[in-house]
A protein has these predicted regions:
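Low-complexity, S/T/G/P-rich flexible repeat/linker segments used as non-globular hinges
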Residues: 63, 136-163
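A generic structural micro-feature
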Residues: 120-126, 144-148
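Alpha-helical transmembrane segments of polytopic integral membrane proteins
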Residues: 42, 134-137
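Short amphipathic beta-strand and strand-loop transition segments with alternating hydrophobic
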Residues: 101-121
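Alpha-helical assembly-interface signal, strongest on the long, hydrophobic N-terminal helix that forms
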Residues: 2-89, 93
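Outer-membrane beta-barrel architecture
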Residues: 104, 125-127, 151
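Short secondary-structure junctions
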Residues: 91-102
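A short hydrophobic beta-strand element
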Residues: 124-134
Length: 163
């Protein structure tokens, strides 16, 4: 009889220990999941900024219906350059739902030069910035840190300009 009572006591103890440890383990697991999602989001916006900067560097415009960066042609109308770069970068980050409004494009002169970059000239630096707001899916982590603003900028020299 004493063995049965000891066994029940041990079973109850294990249940209490499990009840105390389980929420911590779940929180840790969800934190790891959110951390992985944050790394994925940052890598995606970094790739999008790079893709947009490459299109800006060669002064090309996307020709595929989806607006991605794989098929390009020279820009006949330079006023389309910003549109093409923004569309390319936003399309590269489709998985995050990034729109063209989250992409900023600017052209600056290299330091120590008198090069004018309005309109764009060869040698100007194309700056493409992609912004994203990351929302953790774990409620307790979301309450502690809130939303996390992410931004990635890619800078490349303009290699060619078409008339």
């Amino acid at each position: 009889m004493k063995q049965l009572a000891d066994r029940r006591r041990r079973d109850g103890q294990a249940l209490v220990e499990f009840a105390l440890v389980f929420p911590v383990l779940i929180l840790l697991l969800l934190g790891i999941l959110d951390f992985g999602r944050a790394i994925y989001a940052y890598n995606t916006i970094a790739d999008a900024a790079r893709d947009g900067a490459r299109v800006a560097a060669v002064n090309q415009i996307a020709t595929s219906p989806a607006g991605d960066c794989t098929q390009t042609r020279p820009i006949e109308d330079p006023s389309n350059a910003h549109w093409s770069v923004k569309t390319c970068a936003a399309t590269s980050a489709t998985a995050l739902g990034i729109q063209t409004g989250a992409v900023t494009v600017s052209y600056t002169a290299p330091p120590g030069t008198t090069l004018t970059c309005t309109p764009v000239n060869v040698g100007c630096i194309a700056n493409v910035t992609v912004d994203y707001v990351f929302n953790p899916i774990t409620p307790i982590i979301g309450n502690i840190v809130g939303t996390i603003g992410m931004s990635s900028t890619s800078k490349v020299p303009v290699e060619r300009v078409f008339p």
